[in-house]
Amino acid sequence: MSKWRKKQLQEIAFLRPTETLKKGDIAPNIPMANIKEFQRDVVKIDYSEFRGGTKFRNGDTLLAKITPCLENGKTAFVNCLQEDEIGFGSTEFIVLRAKENIDERFLYYLSISPEFRKQAISLMEGTSGRKRVNENALKISDFLIPDFEEQRKIANILSAIDDKIQINNQINQELEAMAKTLYDYWFVQFDFPDQNGKPYKSSGGKMVYHPELKREIPEGWGVESVGNLLDKVTKAEKIENNLIEFIGEIPVIDQSQKYIAGFTNNENGLIQPQKGHVIFGDHTRVVKYINFDYARGADGTQVLISKNEHIFKE
């Protein structure tokens, strides 16, 4: 293992490197909304008229500098542009470009490391709700850096993990689409398999009108209040967004699209399901099934358990 040396950020990276785009040019645009929390790749590119903003190219890192985007982990590695293409984005990005003998992917992984994030967040200034990182202070901050060969090895390993995560996310999206289709067949079209394996309603299954729902439902089905079927877990401390770490002992589950929001070492937030919990976002309506020890995120993350003998319990 090489010796790690302490270097200022400005020694290893250009901050806001100079690029040229003419006002009025149509160019790739990456707004803040197109960067997801703790996700390496940009979600999508928009093409629009350049009127101002930060400019970047492939290999650069986009680091959100404003609250709560920085605390929430909005940092991305640009690899979605054409060769020699210049893109632009929010003025709330700090653009990092690797200098000589610095692996550009290593620079990205450095920027999402707990040490870097903690330092950047500590340098935020301004009024509550509109705080921004002091870039002049950030660029003279010290970080431990290995030699180029070890940087590349570290980046290769972490990139392979991110590639695997991306594949798993795609698989999850396909499975979710299948689950929605299955739900539609069962509970909207009522074409679940009958005793002969045929679609119930399409095969002449008996339907009865339900006055409360003002529609027909399969014979034998009933209507029940959600409150009579499910209960909420209120115990355990909730983990605020700005306290969620990139690395830790306990995974944090919140109501975002991301399955695991991050990690914490706060054991007061630990929840240990016997078999599994359903997580429901009362803002996002995102639903997750969790069957491992975890901590709950704050701001609308609900933990649901069954209180009805006919519904699977933890």
Residue ranges of predicted features:
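Short alpha-helix capping/helix-loop boundary micro-motifs
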Residues: 41-51
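Non-catalytic DNA-recognition/assembly elements of restriction-modification systems
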Residues: 1-20, 144, 148-153, 159-185, ...
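Short beta-strand/loop turn elements enriched in aromatics
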Residues: 14-36
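A short beta-sheet element
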Residues: 53-54, 58-113, 258-314
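Short, solvent-exposed loop/turn positions at domain surfaces
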Residues: 49-50, 127, 266
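Short, basic/aromatic beta-hairpin or loop at an interaction surface
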Residues: 28-43, 84-87, 251-254
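A short glycine-rich beta-alpha junction/loop motif
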Residues: 2, 85-94, 125-155, 294-302
